[in-house]
Amino acid sequence: MKILLCIVLLLVVLTLFAVWPGKRRDALRAPFLGRNCAHRGFFGKDQRPPENSLPAFVAAAKNGYGIELDVQFTADRRIVVFHDDTLDRMTPAKGFVHDMPWAEFSAQPLAGSDEHPPLFADMLRTVAEANPDTPLIVEIKSRSEYNHTYLEELCRATIAELKTYPGPYCIESFDPRVVGIVRRQAPGLLRGQLADSYRSYRKTGAHPVPAFVFSHCLGNFLGRPDFIAWCPEKRNWAVRLCARLGAMMVMWTALPEHDTRKLEAENDAVIFQWYAPKQQYK
């Protein structure tokens, strides 16, 4: 009985160590609290303007919203704003973004429009000109095959470009390794751990073990995130524990069919898509 009790206690301690978020840093949180942030910019279901395009970002900034966006490397290490790992959904091309050089990638039309994928630097400059106070939530894209050196270079380059932006910003990622690297490279920067539900991870083909680890924020010990960005599904016990331990709660992605008032009441910030909420709800 004593051995069993010790095992249970050890598991509790290890779980707490794994999921414990970072210390509250209210000054860093303040620009994001109660804000509605446009997911990949302010765009419609018809992709006019296209997601993650300069017009979508300008529309979000001029309407007073925060902006969520995605960054990754091209083959020649240019930081671009693009969500998918592959090009086929948003462009006529095929293949991975990280395998295509910038000159070829930049020529691809977005969703059949006259717009093209922007460089991160151009996006930052454009938003600063439209509304320099726009809060930015920057998701660093990652894949399991990316090694530590590659991710360190991507994080370092992203952070360097963000330093040119006059407004508030933070970094998030689904990959706890990225959050950990940001913690080491820029400890004074607000950082967040993105998480999806176990069911969603399994639907995309993830093995049960990593699906459980990622959905239950068991990689938080690497980055000690300031916030957890959680999906529309009911929070699991680990996400609820993070909230109780002081993590800022961000919701992604609120859609028109959701109870958006409830989501705003339950979260410190909301990442929305395909509707026009108030800029600030708290």
For each predicted feature, which ranges?
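Phosphate-group recognition and catalysis centered on beta-loop-alpha active-site segments
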Residues: 2-282
